[in-house]
Amino acid sequence: MITKRIIPCLDVKDGRVVKGVNFQGLSDVSSPVELGQYYSDSGADELVFYDITASSEGRRLFTDILTEVARTIFIPLTVGGGISTLDDFDRVLKCGADKVSVNSGAIRNPRLIFEAAKRYGDQCVVLSADVKRVDGVFRVFAKGGRENTGMEAIAWIKKGVELGAGEVVVNSIDTDGVKRGFDLEMLDAVCSAVSVPVIASGGAGGIGDFVTLFKTIPRVDAGLAASIFHFGEVTIPALKAALKENKIPVREV
C-alpha cells in the first residue's frame, strides 16, 4: 500500500521562513536551515522550499540558502519561486533540489512544463497552483496569490499534467493559514481530473484535519502544512502515530 506523505513547507522571504494568513500579513518564524534540519530529523517525508516573493519581485530564487538547506537535510526537497526557464531548473537542481515546482512561470509560458519534463523527467516537475474561489468558480492566481489570472483552476491543472507535470500541489488561498481544515471540495475536483499524485496545501489546523483529508479523499497523496508545524502545534511523530491509529499508511518515523 502506498504511504501518505507529510510535507512541511518553508515559505522563505529575505532569507527567513515566514508565515501569513490567506497569503497576507507575513510574520517571521525561523531560519530555513535550522527548520529544515529539524523536520528532516523529525520524520517528515519531504520538504518544500518556496521563495515566495521571487516571482512578484521579478528576480531569481535565492540559491545560497537553498544550497545550505539541501546539504543539511536527508529527505527529498522540492523547490519553487521565480522558476521561469530551464536555466532556473538547472540552477536549483545543482543546489541539491530533487524536484522543481513551477507556478507563475508556467502560467506565462506553459511550454516550460513540457520542456522541463522532456529534459529532466516528469517526476522532477511539480505544478503548484494557487487557487481561490471567485464568484463560486475555482480560479488560478499568480505572483504569490496576488494576481487573478482568470483561468479556471481544474482546466489549468489538467493542462499542466498533460504537458508533463508529474505531481500537483494545490494551494488553497481561501483556507491558507486559517486552520479550519483543507479545502476538500477543491481537492476532490482536482483528484477526479488528474491521475498524478496530488498534494493538499492550505488549512491544516490540527491532526484531525489530516485524518479527515486522507479518509475523505483517499486519492490525495500527501498533506502539506506550515503554521502548525512551525509553531509546534502539531509534531510530525504525533501526527504519524494518529494516522497509523486510523489505519492510514505512513512511513515510520
What are the functions of these language-model segments?
Residues I113-Y120, F214-E252:
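C-terminal helical cap(s) of enzyme catalytic domains, especially alpha/beta-barrels
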Residues L77-T78, I83-G96, E185-A222:
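Catalytic cores of alpha/beta
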Residues E46-D64, S104, V169-G181:
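Glycine-rich, proline-tolerant flexible connector loops at the mouths of alpha/beta enzymes
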Residues D11, Y39, L47, V79, ...:
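Conserved, mostly hydrophobic/aromatic
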Residues E57-T78, E115-D130, R180-G205, K247-I248:
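Alpha-helix-loop-beta-strand connector modules within alpha/beta enzyme cores
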Residues T53, L61-Y120:
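Glycine/small-residue-rich loop that forms an oxyanion/phosphate-binding "nest" at active or ligand-binding sites
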Residues V12-D14, V18, A97-V170, D174-T175:
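Conserved anion-binding
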Residues R5-C9, E46, F74-T78, K99-S101, ...:
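Structural preference for beta-strand elements that scaffold enzyme active sites
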